[in-house]
Amino acid sequence: MHLFSKSILPALGLCLLTVAPLRADVNSDLAFSNFNNVDLNALADGSILQVRGGLVYFQRGIITQSLYMVDATPSEVAAKLVHWNPADHSKLQVWIHKKLPANPKPSDFADLASLPNNSSVKFLRDATAKFDPKAPSIQVSKEEAQLLAASASQSGDAQNRFVTVWSQILAGRFTDFLNGHFSSESYAGQGGEIRSLDEIKSLIHSDPKVYIQFQRLFNQTPIRAAGASKSLPANLYYQSFDIQGSSTLVDGAIYQASNGPSIQSVDIDFYINYGVFATLELEEMWPVTVNGKTKTLVWRDDLVSAPSIAYLHGTERLASGLIMLQDVKANIEAFRSEFK
């Protein structure tokens, strides 16, 4: 937990930076989080506050929380979360990030052909070309394994086969996610079959206060509880990024809704074909005023389920959390630079 009480003075001490919430008490808004006694003056100066999430009883889970301010309105920040392209920031090692239509088809993944020729992507191409269903190095279902095995047995251009088979798999995952079949989606993982929905539900239930805060939004997405309301419109994308020197392919969906004076957002990476089982990124955005101008206070929660985390204990698990905090901070800095 971080406690900030120092006021920030502008250069030359010309005036005191004044920050005022548009509601009665920002700290009461943050009561569900791991932050309290937050000094908005420090955040208005560009600081990013970060803490590890609460105690996670889910063995494969790790969670971090961040708090920062953006020089824009909440609606502008929410829109940027949907439309920004992390691939424009080389430090993040995102090779491709593409928006998708409401019902993606295999033809919408043609940009897979534009993945860079680097060692990270080479891992993914080689794992596809040499796929062995008896010893898979990438995370796929039994049916998807058959597609990959058939592709690997074919002759012809390896690049075309790579694009064709992954276009089919990624589009198929979106179809199931959007049409009520997400609960049955799975893939072979260490220790047996892994169901993406189970991983996501374990993550979101790890912190009861955060779950209650976002329950209404969760229940308007495909991860909703049984009998919950219909899903909100989804902002869909796919991407490829580096995980410890190896590339992964990801299907993701962003859902947003107002929550009184704030806006909530959940970004669900519901299919990841290597290294990680599932991730979620939660944001809540409130308006604040700084010297008479509206800015946005952003609370962010990053939740990750990965096979390697289950084997970490003590200082190793702590170190993993610290590395994750650094990665999240780099992502926030890149995102915030889009407003300059």
Give the location of each predicted region.
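Bacterial N-terminal signal peptides that target proteins for export
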Residues: 1-10
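Terminal "cap-and-tail" regions of soluble proteins that handle hydrophobic small molecules
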Residues: 25-76, 82, 86-340
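Bacterial N-terminal signal peptides
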Residues: 10-19
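Sec/Tat signal peptide C-region and signal peptidase I cleavage site
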Residues: 20-24
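Polar helix-capping/helix-linker motif
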Residues: 5, 19, 83-86
